[in-house]
A protein has these predicted regions:
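Alpha-helical transmembrane segments and their immediate interhelical/interface regions
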Residues: 1-32, 165-186
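Hydrophobic alpha-helical transmembrane segments of multi-pass integral membrane proteins
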Residues: 1-26, 211-226, 237-276, 280-281, ...
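Alpha-helical transmembrane segments of multi-pass membrane proteins
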Residues: 1-11, 36-59, 76-83, 243-257, ...
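Transmembrane alpha-helical segments of multi-pass membrane transport proteins and ion-pumping complexes
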Residues: 9-16, 20, 24, 50, ...
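Membrane-core helix-loop-helix motifs of multi-pass transport proteins
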Residues: 26-116, 306-339
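Short amphipathic alpha-helical coupling elements at transmembrane boundaries
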Residues: 28-35, 197-208, 234-238, 275-279, ...
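Hydrophobic transmembrane alpha-helices of multi-pass small-molecule transporters
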Residues: 87-100, 104-208, 212, 327-330, ...
Length: 347
C-alpha cells in the first residue's frame, strides 16, 4: 500500500491524468503478485493520491493559470508564480500532514481476512498489430523516427530557453505544461503514426468523461448566470473573518465542485468572487487560492467523474470503491479545515 501511494503521489506531480490511469494498473499488478490485498481499497487509496497530489503539483489548472501572463484576474492579483502558490510553507506543511495521514488511514482500513476482495480478473495482453505501410512519401513520413525526433529536439530547445529566461517554477503556465508533454511524447513515440494510434486508444478511457462534460458545462452556465455563485460567496463574506476566510473558501469550492467538476471552469465562476471577498476582508490571497484547490480536489472523492477512467482500466464499478473514497473525504475535511485555520498562525 505504501509503495502504491508513494508512486501515486509522484506520478500525480507529473500529471493528474497520467496518475489516474497508471496507479490502478500498478494496484492491479501488485494485487496479482501479493495475496490478501483488499483491491477496492487499493484503487480508492491510489485515486486519492492523484487528487491530493494536485495540491502540490505543477499541473493543477489554477496554479498554472494564475502563473500565466495575461490571465483574467491579473489586474487584481497579478501573476503568482508556483513558488508562491504551491511551494509556500503553509501549503507544503498541510500537504505533508494529509499525505502521511492518508497513507496511515489506508493501511489501517483493512477488512477482516474473510471479507477481503482480491483482484481476480485476468487481462489479456494486447497484441501489437503490425501496420503495413504503403510505399509513398506520406506513409514513409508517418512511420519516420526522424520527424518525431526533429520536433522533439526543437521543443526541447524552446523548453530549455524558457527555463533559462523565467526559471523552472516561473515557466509552469498552462500552455507551457501542455507544450512540455507534447515534446516528451515526441521522444516516447518513434513515429507520428504510433503517437496518433496511442492517442486514439486512450481516448476510449475518457469517453464517459467527455460525454458528461457538456452537461456540467450547462450547470456551470446556470450557476454563473443565475447569480448562485455570487450568493454563496456573499454568504461567506458575511460570516468569514480574515483568519477563517481560507476555510470558507475551501468549503465553498468543495460544494461548487459537486456541480462543476472542472477546476479551471470552477475558477472562472468562483475566482473573481473569492478574490473580491479576500480583498474586502484583507485576507491572504495565496492561502485563498490554495484553499480553493484543496476544496475543489477534495470532493472529487465524492464526485465520481474522474475515477471512471481508472475503474475502466481494472474492470470495476463505482459502487466497489465509493464507500472508501467517502471515508477518506471525511478525514480530509476535518484535517484541511483545521489546517487552513491554524497552520498560517504558526508557519
Amino acid at each position: 500500500m505504501i509503495l502504491l501511494m508513494l508512486f501515486g503521489y509522484v506520478s500525480s506531480f507529473v500529471n493528474w491524468a497520467f496518475c489516474t490511469v497508471v496507479t490502478p494498473i500498478l494496484a492491479m499488478q501488485l494485487s496479482k503478485q501479493i495475496k490478501g490485498l483488499h483491491f477496492p481499497m487499493m484503487i480508492a487509496a491510489g485515486y486519492s493520491t492523484m487528487i491530493l497530489g494536485q495540491c502540490l503539483g505543477p499541473s493543477a489548472s489554477v496554479f498554472a493559470l494564475v502563473a500565466t501572463e495575461g490571465h483574467f484576474l491579473q489586474d487584481k492579483i497579478g501573476i503568482l508564480t508556483q513558488d508562491q502558490t504551491v511551494y509556500n510553507g503553509v501549503n507544503v506543511t498541510l500537504f505533508t500532514i494529509i499525505a502521511i495521514f492518508t497513507v496511515i488511514l489506508s493501511i489501517l482500513t483493512v477488512p477482516p481476512q474473510d471479507e477481503v476482495v482480491e483482484f481476480k480478473k485476468e487481462f489479456d495482453d494486447d497484441v501489437e498489430e503490425e501496420i503495413e505501410l504503403e510505399n509513398t512519401i506520406a506513409d514513409k513520413l508517418n512511420g519516420s523516427k526522424i520527424i518525431m525526433y526533429l520536433i522533439g529536439i526543437a521543443g526541447a530547445i524552446v523548453i530549455i530557453l524558457t527555463f533559462v529566461e523565467k526559471g523552472i517554477l516561473g515557466s509552469l503556465s498552462v500552455n507551457f505544461i501542455i507544450f512540455l508533454f507534447m515534446t516528451i511524447n515526441c521522444f516516447l513515440y518513434n513515429s507520428p503514426r504510433k503517437f496518433v494510434d496511442a492517442y486514439k486508444e486512450n481516448m476510449v478511457l475518457t469517453t464517459e468523461v467527455v460525454i458528461q462534460f457538456p452537461f456540467y458545462g450547462g450547470l456551470m452556465g446556470m450557476i454563473t448566470n443565475s447569480g448562485f455563485g455570487a450568493v454563496i460567496v456573499q454568504a461567506i463574506v458575511n460570516v468569514a473573518t480574515t483568519t477563517s476566510m481560507p476555510v470558507w473558501a475551501y468549503i465553498s469550492a468543495s460544494l461548487t465542485n459537486l456541480f462543476i467538476p472542472s477546476q479551471g471552469g470552477q475558477w472562472i465562476v468562483q475566482g473573481p468572487l473569492l478574490v473580491e471577498a479576500a480583498q474586502q476582508l484583507n485576507a491572504n490571497i495565496i492561502h485563498i487560492i490554495d484553499a480553493f484547490v484543496y476544496g475543489d480536489e477534495a470532493t472529487n472523492l465524492l464526485q465520481p467523474l474522474y475515477v471512471i477512467p481508472a475503474l475502466s482500466v481494472v474492470g470495476m464499478k463505482l459502487k466497489d470503491v465509493w464507500g472508501f473514497m467517502a471515508f477518506i473525504w471525511v478525514f480530509w475535511l476535518i484535517l484541511t479545515t483545521l489546517g487552513f485555520y491554524f497552520i498560517p498562525m504558526i508557519v
